[in-house]
Swiss-Prot record:
Gene: leuA
Reaction(s) catalysed (UniProt annotation): 3-methyl-2-oxobutanoate + acetyl-CoA + H2O = (2S)-2-isopropylmalate + CoA + H(+)
Domain Pyruvate carboxyltransferase span(s) in chain numbering: 5-268
Membership in a protein family: Belongs to the alpha-IPM synthase/homocitrate synthase family. LeuA type 1 subfamily.
Role played: Catalyzes the condensation of the acetyl group of acetyl-CoA with 3-methyl-2-oxobutanoate (2-ketoisovalerate) to form 3-carboxy-3-hydroxy-4-methylpentanoate (2-isopropylmalate).
Biological process (GO), any one: L-leucine biosynthetic process
Species of the source: Albidiferax ferrireducens (strain ATCC BAA-621 / DSM 15236 / T118)
Name used for this protein in its record: 2-isopropylmalate synthase
Species lineage: Bacteria, Pseudomonadati, Pseudomonadota, Betaproteobacteria, Burkholderiales
Amino acid sequence: MADQLIIFDTTLRDGEQSPGASMNKDEKLRIARQLERLKVDVIEAGFAASSNGDFEAVQGIARAIKDSTICSLSRANDRDISRAAEALKGANRSRIHTFIATSALHMEKKLRMTPDQVFEQAKLAVRFARNLVADVEFSPEDAYRSDEDFLCRVIEAAINEGATTINVPDTVGYAIPELYGTFIKTLRERVPNSDKAIWSVHCHNDLGMAVANSLAGVKIGGARQVECTINGLGERAGNCSLEEVVMAVKTRRDYFGLDVDIETQHILAASRMVSQITGFVVQPNKAIVGANAFAHAAGIHQDGVLKARDTYEIMRAEDVGWSANKIVLSKVSGRNAFKQRLQDLGAQMESESDVNAAFARFKELADRKSEIFDEDILALVGSESVAREKEQYSFVSLSQHSETGERPQASIVFTADGKEVKSSSDGDGPVDASLKAIEAQVKSGAEMVLYSVNAISGSTESQGEVTVRLQHGGRVVNGVGADPDIIVASAKAYLSALSKLHSKADRVAAQG
């Protein structure tokens, strides 16, 4: 029988550390539910001690999710660990993930602690956490750049104190696959009690090798847990990509000899949801979930695939949630057909009221578009106006006038705390005029640091998905809006970003 590989998803914690990727607690819960549908083994729901908002998010996820272990990160101190345990009280299965840096650079420059002090603090932290929960994970931060002898001492002590998982981070993405795999193997051989814990890998993508390093840690090193994120989301160049690791292990089971429990047909819906909520667009050539992942342009390749799929395809697109049926619904489609299509796409809603709300928006869209594509459906149900807590600002209507040689004019109606607001402005273009009209009333003072438009499907009547990133007072937030009218989509995205900007709580920095 093959060994089991544990999938530990940290999209909601490490993934959220990407500048602009902050999520509110309702958005985190939606992603957590999708991760549960994927059958992710462990969901790191956040860093409970970092802010009241993160505490509430971890607490809400712990109470709602039944099939996955829910984990909270904590620094190696009693306050953080107690806060994590408190947030996790309602979970069916809970884990505290505590960490402290062990590299000479981090100990000296960041912690200003001696190795002996770090050693003692690591021991005490694991001991304290183990008295609160049965499942404790310990991470020596920046492990790959740590002194090997010292690292072995710390890990041995952590296991003696009750750590059930030892995670070995390549915090800055410095590792090379063969060397990292050998590093994990050496640690497991040198630590006397290594067989008492599950070994885990956590790799960053600074040199583009997070997935390769993680797989080497599994194959060469014998790790049996991989820490990863949907779409490889994470600070700097990102984290190990969940979808790539899972499909590599499943597709090359002959090589890895491992099983994973992930329900892969829900991968695309998870990717789309994370992209839509965070505003981080998936590149077209991204493995597994990119728009071109299963596309063949060369004539010889197309001919081969038509004759036999396995000539150029090593996976079936349907296995990760893609559908060969591009035009799926129209304005005459009923609610049952719509609900079935959601299920086919792995995009189930949380309740019947959410289905009704999504169906109403689908009918509105169908009145404006003759053909509704899978991508339209995923954008629609992933939009922030479905199944989320009420936003401070929401779009109502917009009109604009533009003629060659004249400055465009825009008039917009939106709600602010439930009250309708009307505003008009001119601008350098219709989008500029619309956003200036909003700003004239809101007066946020925020700086726009990103504006991007992505066509959801390939036709001229495609919905445009707009991402707006705002920065103010050290805060960076994303807003996303989708609509066949790019100007309307832009206004929706801007209002969404403003709502996040005004509700985001301050938080402290966490481990990489």
